[in-house]
């Protein structure tokens, strides 16, 4: 199997796993009383969390595919890029969250998705073509 195909399969699999884990964590948080409402009273649905996790993870896999094709050191660039993007992704939950429990949960969801997708894709990028 080519590296591109392995990257697509691994990346999509990691995206689905990350989305499922995020959905479970969000549902548990909601059951524990975290309202997951951002400023303005807009509640974030669990299905929305899962959907956005998949979409942004797939976008990350596309970035990895581009790095694999056009970079001499795709793993290093993947890790640098994902560290920056993960850090940037933590800003909106902190700024938009209505309360500390919601902000903490949203930050945890971002970090959980990164903890699943980033190493899975990095391992695939390390595999010879």
Regions found by a protein language model. Give the residues of each.
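N-terminal signal-anchor transmembrane alpha-helix
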Residues: 1-29
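Membrane-interface helix termini and inter-helical loops of multi-pass transporters
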Residues: 31-42, 97-98
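Membrane-water interface at the C-terminal end of transmembrane alpha helices
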Residues: 10-18, 112-129
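Hydrophobic alpha-helical transmembrane segments
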Residues: 8-16, 50-54, 79-83, 104-108
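Membrane-helix boundary connector in multi-pass membrane proteins
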Residues: 91-105
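Internal alpha-helical transmembrane segments of multi-pass membrane proteins
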Residues: 7, 65-84
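Core segments of alpha-helical transmembrane spans in multipass integral membrane proteins
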Residues: 46-65, 80-91
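Transmembrane alpha-helical segments of multi-pass membrane transport proteins and ion-pumping complexes
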Residues: 18-30, 57-65, 114-119
């Amino acid at each position: 199997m080519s590296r591109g195909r392995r990257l697509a399969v691994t990346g999509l699999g990691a995206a689905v796993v990350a989305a499922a884990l995020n959905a479970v964590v969000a549902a548990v948080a909601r059951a524990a009383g975290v309202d997951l409402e951002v400023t303005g009273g807009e509640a974030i649905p669990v299905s929305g969390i899962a959907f956005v996790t998949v979409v942004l993870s797939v976008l990350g896999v596309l970035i990895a595919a581009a790095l694999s094709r056009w970079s001499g050191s795709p793993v290093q660039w993947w890790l640098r890029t994902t560290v920056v993007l993960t850090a940037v992704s933590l800003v909106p939950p902190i700024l938009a969250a209505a309360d500390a429990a919601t902000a903490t949960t949203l930050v945890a969801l971002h970090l959980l998705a990164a903890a699943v997708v980033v190493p899975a894709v990095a391992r695939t990028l390390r595999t010879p073509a």
